[in-house]
Amino acid sequence: MSKLQIIQSKGQYINGEWIKGNGLILESTNPASGTLLWQGNNATDEEIANACYVAHRALKSWANTSFEERARYTKAFVEQVEKNRDQLARLISLETGKPLWESQTEVSSVIGKVNLSIQAYQERTWPKQTETAEANACLRFKPHGVVVVLGAFNFPAHLSNGHIVPALLAGNTVLYKPSEHTPAVAELIIQCWHDSGLPPGVINCLQGNANCGNTLLSQDIQGVYFTGSYATGLRIHQQFCNRPEIILALEMGGNNPLVIDEVKDIDAAVYHTMLSTMITAGQRCTCARRIIVPDSQTGDLFLERFAKACKLMRIGSFDSQPEPFIGPVISHVQALKHLHAQKQLVEMGGEIILPMSLLVEYTGLISPGIIDMTRAKNPPDEEIFAPFAQIYRYNHFDEAIQLANQTRYGLSAGLLSDNKDHYLQFYQHIRAGLINWNRPTTGAASSLPFGGVGCSGNHRPSAYFAADYCAYPVASMEQPLLTTPAQRLPGLVLE
């Protein structure tokens, strides 16, 4: 990789201006090399309070702006992203370590999200009116107010965008805190919003660590939209347990199962399993963590080919040639945590099929791992956010479903099977928000809702259903002229 110049932060984005930060130093690194990429500052308490103030000040005007005008700004944002497509894709790869092909796909998702969000808003929150004998029954929707969007590092542009765009379309103003791992990507996204001509104060960006996030959540806000770990989502939920008026949309990952049935095309099963478990270095919330495999010749052959495919998988920096399938996990610190988690599973009785190991010192580059947990005692129901698959063997299909449901989470689940009846049985009994058949567990569409049950979420699915948590319904009975009804209720006398 060629030597990179360190990106100096533009500062915090408040009231339509970049303001040089005064807080503690914040840095992001390229996880494939460990080199410093971006340098800036954490937002101070004063900067956070000021951002909240200007967001409230901008709210009335923005909420009263017509939907068509708000949509025009989002389309202007798309035009800016298009202009910066190559730069944004490269920056995503530099800051997350993703292969360039995957970052380019993410940029396309950012662009496509706007029209889908406009369509979803018009379908799910469009005003309706019904005439009755006595009055007009009207349904309209209002924005919540000032909402906080907490970004995730694995899709630093797309996932945040999936909250921001619907929130703005609905008339909310936004306080955006990106992941501390991906501040450079956030700055470019915000610059695109700035160049779209969006009015000052409608979106504000505050860079910082978890402490900044906590300060932000203590402000006068009306909603929090979060994508991340269960532990962080639970803390947010607990922080607002005495404030039921705050709407929370929490997407918190999962310990997702993928069941392999008796299939004819083993190579196809391996391919879809690779996309389920290893894509994005296992750092998608929908990645399959538990692979449930028949204890049969089919299962043995599948595991043999799956392990071989993992060994042959290309891993490296985004600009390596030939192109890698995956890059690093987000940091060296996280890589070490994942290796420690693997060690703990071995101590519980897990049998290593393919060891996950650190490939380059002081980076996030780790090789994929596979461990057989069939005979392990009390394996933890935890999400290991890495290219790491836990294998469980089963003897009959009912047992496979039982194993799949042995989790407190419920985000995604998948079945690879030639048997439609088995899929119908699987679909009926599996508890998850995304259930796929002969597709990777990571396969999702922005034209559908995205969210889970159990510890994976709080019944506020995003994607196409994000419009639902960005506005609240208002029911009105209306008539333009005040009149006394021809038939009055008994016992009521007017003089």
Swiss-Prot record:
The active site is at E251, C285. NAD(+) binds at G228, S229, Y230, A231, T232, G233. InterPro entries: Ald_DH/histidinol_DH, Ald_DH_C, Ald_DH_CS_GLU, Ald_DH_N, Aldehyde_DH_dom, SuccinylGlu_semiald_DH_AstD. Transmembrane segments: none annotated. Its EC number is 1.2.1.71. Keywords: Arginine metabolism, NAD, Oxidoreductase. This is N-succinylglutamate 5-semialdehyde dehydrogenase. It comes from Legionella pneumophila (strain Lens). The gene is astD.
